[in-house]
Each structure stands twice: as C-alpha cells, then as structure tokens.
Amino acid sequence: MAYFNQHQSMISKRYLTFFSKSKKKKPFSAGQLIGLILGPLLFLLTLLFFHPQDLPWEGVYVLAITLWIATWWITEAIPIAATSLLPIVLLPLGHILTPEQVSSEYGNDIIFLFLGGFILAIAMERWNLHTRVALTIINLIGASTSKILLGFMVATGFLSMFVSNTAAVMIMIPIGLAIIKEAHDLQEANTNQTSIQKFEKSLVLAIGYAGTIGGLGTLIGTPPLIILKGQYMQHFGHEISFAKWMIVGIPTVIVLLGITWLYLRYVAFRHDLKYLPGGQTLIKQKLDELGKMKYEEKVVQTIFVLASLLWITREFLLKKWEVTSSVADGTIAIFISILLFVIPAKNTEKHRRIIDWEVAKELPWGVLILFGGGLALAKGISESGLAKWLGEQLKSLNGVSPILIVIVITIFVLFLTEVTSNTATATMILPILATLSVAVGVHPLLLMAPAAMAANCAYMLPVGTPPNAIIFGSGKISIKQMASVGFWVNLISAIIIILVVYYVMPIVLGIDINQPLPLK
C-alpha cells in the first residue's frame, strides 16, 4: 500500500507541476496578454463599426460581448470562471436583461444537478468506495494481459460516469503503475522486456482514454453534456432527461471502450505477453488491504443506487405522480446531497457525518460559474435578436447534406478541444449550432449533441484534458506516442459519435432529425 500511496502522491505532484510550468511568477503569459487586450478591443470595434441594417443595436451589443468573452475563454486571459462573471456586469449595462434575469441563470436547475453530482462523487472518494469498486471490477474480469487492460478500462470508464474524469484517472493510475512495477520485479527469464514495455504504455493510455470516454455515459459525467442539456432547454424549451441520455450514452461508452481496447491491445501496442507476472496477485492483495466493506461505504453505495434509480425512473414514473410531477434532475441531486449531510458516520474520528460542509473546499465552484455564465450569455443572445439574425445569415447553408454538416462539426470540435478547454468550447459553440439548426432545417440535437460529445474527446496532447496530463505525468509515455495513438482514437471517436447521433439518438429520444424546432 505504501507503493500505491507513494505513486499517487508522485502523480499528483507531476500533474500539478505540468499545469503550473507556464505560469511561473509572471502575471500574464504572452498569449494571455494578447487575449486580455484583444477581448475588449473586439468589443469596442464591433460596437463602433459593425451595424448591419437587419440587426438591432441590442444584437450588436450582445455580439460584441460574446466576442470579448470568447476571446478571454480561449486565451484564458483571466481564469475562465472569472470571465464567466462578465454577463452579470455587461448584460444589464446594455439593458439586454435585468440583473435578476441574469443572476437567475447562475442558479439554473442544471447547475444544481452538477453540484449534487459532485457532492455524491466526493462522498465516494472520502470513504474510498470508488477504489473498492475499481479493484473489484478488475479482479472479476481476469488475469491475462488482455483482460487486465480491459478491466482497467471498464473500471475507469464506469467511475468517470459518476466522478470527474480527473478523479477516476487519479485513482487508477497508481494501481496501474504498481502492477507494472510488480511485473518488472517478477519478470521471468523467458519474458520479453519489450512486451512488458508495450503493455505498460498501453495500460497507461488505456486508463487515461477510458477516463475521458466514460464521461459520455451520463449527463453528470462531463461538463459539455451538462452544457448541452442547459443550452437545449434555454434555446428550445425542451429537456434531455438523465435516463434517456444514459440509453444513448452508455452504449456509446461500451462501443468506444471496446474498439479503443482492441486498438491499443492488438494494433498500437501489439505484444506476445499473455500473462503479467504478479498482476492478479497484486489486485487481490489491494482488495484484501481494504478489508470488509465499512458502514460508511455501504451508506454511500445505498445513496448512489437510490440516486441512480430516481434519475432513471423520473421520466416515466415520478412525472406521472402529482406530488413528484415537477421534480427535476437537479431536485433529485440536491435531495441526495442533503441525505449525505444528514446521515451520521460511525468513524467519528474521521468525520461526524457522511459529508460535512468541509466538502465546500473540494467543490469545483469555477465550473458551476462557467455553466451559469454560458446560460446567461445564451439568454442574452436569444433576447437581443442576435440568435434570429445569425439564423438568417446561416440560411446559405440550407440544402447542404445534414450528415456532411455533422461530420464537419464533430471533427472540427474534436480537434479544437485538443488545445482549448472542453467546457469553454462547448459553451461557445452550442448556441451557434442551436441557431444553425433552424437555418438548415434540422433538429438541433443533430448538431448540438455531436459537438458536446466531441468536446469531451481529446486524446492527442497532454493539454487536451486533465486525464491526458496525468498519464503524461507518469513518465511512461512521450508526447509523440500520445499524439500518434491519440490521433487514431480521435478518428474512432468521431466515427462512433456520428453513427450514434445519426442513427441511435433519434430512436431513443423520439426525435425527427429533419424536423427543426423554433427558437424560444
């Protein structure tokens, strides 16, 4: 266990170091300084010189705000969350929305859904339930190198549906490194060193990629999907339920995990090592060290199952009862969170209750503010007439094959998110796609869903996602190798996303992809 803890600490330090290298002591990097000046400059230039006859002044003003905010989001001139507070100042200043209207977007039901999801995830991490779940899955799948690789991917993918992708990978990487070290230490005379090295590279990448892929399974799995849910409701007044998205998302995750596993095992890192020395023994040892399931773990497990059942049954059961007919996914998330605050813990030396308010220090408030800022900006775009004007300009695309548009959007966003924040990318591009759907005469989810899913998928560069940074920080993989392997995983993801959105999603969600929805 000491080795496990030592490597978890080592990975954490490398992960933090990786993201702090460029900051040093300077207040702004060159790119940030350019963005800091360019954002307000674009705002002023738009107000002064951009005056189309068919766009009211309010629309010009919101376009100027959007350019400013988008520039600061892309360049991270100031923290992304701080940029997301600009609508609170700028929208009332231009008399687009009242302060009350803007502020209400930061308390949207979607934000509380994600807040509750975060609290549940932190409860799992606090009482170590996530580690037990991961080790149990790996132990059940098998002992061969192929099965160990698959086991790690399934465990990481499952965890990242409910805890952050970063947390899921941070849990699994030290376990993976411990298995690799054990294999090197117990290496037999007839074992090929090259095969072990190929296996360790495939295992490290498999954990990182599975952490990213798993986020597509549920609405709380990754920020772009929450943004999709919010923007879809904001622009069209329709809801994507937690349960229905799972029917779309989980098969997508299963297929993507399966194909990525086959690619890593039999194409990218093909080797002759059938069984890993000491692999299964180490997994069982880690499980034994956890001991019997503790009271607190059982409580969190029960609450987790309850939350899942409520989210899954809300659409076809809770909505039919008068008492619970107005319950939303966010309502369920907060109800579950309150239960965690109420139930006492037996291990009072550690914590008095399952969750206490110390959890506030661990919550990603910045992400929640970003969601609110995106929703506020989307409302401004709608109320100012900018959305309608953009739709008119995009009508020139009418007649272009919808599948071609989906392919272009998916590939564009997928490679864009390699160098930009996935949350910022989704927040910027989804309102544009909502308007584009009206212009080209297709259902908005045909364009918005692949963009949100693609925004989550970045496999080529360490800066693409936190999981990529973590696995790069392990020292087992080079940027060149990550880019080479990740490029093909990007293409695999693009193909699966396009097929799912075009052929599976319409059936599950009951939509006609050729039927546009009117903007609110």
UniProtKB/Swiss-Prot annotation:
Function: Mediates the transport of the dicarboxylates fumarate, malate, and succinate across the cytoplasmic membrane via a Na(+)-electrochemical gradient.
Species this chain originates from: Staphylococcus aureus (strain bovine RF122 / ET3-1)
Intracellular or extracellular location(s): Cell membrane
Protein name: Sodium-dependent dicarboxylate transporter SdcS
Gene (name only): sdcS
PANTHER family tied to this protein: SOLUTE CARRIER FAMILY 13 MEMBER, SOLUTE CARRIER FAMILY 13 MEMBER 2
Alphabetized GO MF terms: organic anion transmembrane transporter activity; symporter activity
Family: Belongs to the SLC13A/DASS transporter (TC 2.A.47) family. NADC subfamily.
Matches recorded under NCBIfam families: dass
Highest taxon above the source species: Bacteria
